[in-house]
């Protein structure tokens, strides 16, 4: 890891992560013009924030900007049943086949080259997670990473119904490429929610 990457990892991860996340969440909801303007100025300084696609151009708080809606007609979902659209904006970090069979502990995916993790650990490592790991062995996965400036709402990727949500408590590690190549099983350590979707033909998606 070069000096620049080491510094990036230090500044984004070797801090009181959970406390900082809670503070930023509190700060972002303050509805004072000077707080909003200062926060957005700093945000634009360190990112490529583009609000040209946003439905609204003025926001009461930083949080309102972060969860902004898009103008109507943007991000259309492909209606073909054999196509699954991306549920969000994002950069593809990894994709491929879910490897392993036979035992839930053997079913693996990759967060980065050379950094595998067990699917059961991602799903919560309970009885439901073990059953799902076996069900999805041999299936496909894709990892999407949202940068801070991207549109941050999520949408159902195809015609389906939400059957269950599993919440898994955890840390708040940054998921940038530097961290993914430095922290093993990072996704399994972070706070997360597993959404169980089922298509009309019975196919299950996570």
Q: Which residues does each predicted region cover?
A:
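Conserved small/polar residues in nucleotide/adenosyl-binding loops
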Residues: 1-3
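Short helical patches
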Residues: 6-11, 38, 42
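Long amphipathic alpha-helical segments
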Residues: 8-9, 16-25
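Flexible, non-catalytic peripheral segments of proteins
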Residues: 26-32
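Extended, compositionally biased flexible segments
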Residues: 33-125, 134
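Conserved positions in beta-strands of structured domains
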Residues: 93, 163-166
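Cytosolic, membrane-proximal regulatory domains of ion/volume homeostasis and mechanosensation machinery
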Residues: 102-137, 141-151, 157, 165-206
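Phosphate/adenylate-binding glycine loop and adjacent helical scaffold
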Residues: 160
């Amino acid at each position: 890891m070069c000096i620049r990457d080491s510094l990036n990892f230090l500044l984004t991860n070797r801090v009181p992560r959970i406390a900082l996340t809670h503070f930023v969440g509190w700060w972002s909801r303050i509805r004072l013009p000077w707080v909003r303007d200062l926060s957005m100025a700093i945000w634009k300084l360190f990112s490529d924030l583009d609000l040209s696609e946003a439905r609204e151009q003025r926001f009461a708080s930083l949080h309102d900007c972060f969860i902004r809606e898009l103008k109507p007609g943007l991000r259309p979902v492909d209606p073909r049943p054999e196509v699954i659209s991306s549920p969000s904006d994002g950069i593809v970090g990894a994709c491929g086949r879910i490897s392993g069979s036979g035992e839930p502990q053997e079913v693996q995916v990759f967060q980065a080259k050379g950094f595998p993790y067990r699917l059961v650990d991602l799903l919560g490592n309970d009885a439901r997670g073990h059953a799902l790991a076996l069900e999805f062995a041999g299936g496909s996965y894709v990892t999407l990473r949202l940068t801070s400036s991207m549109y941050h709402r999520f949408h159902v990727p195809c015609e389906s119904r939400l059957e269950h949500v599993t919440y898994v408590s955890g840390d708040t590690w940054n998921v940038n490429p530097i961290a993914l190549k430095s922290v093993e099983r990072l996704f399994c350590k972070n706070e997360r929610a597993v959404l169980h979707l089922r298509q009309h033909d019975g196919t299950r998606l996570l």
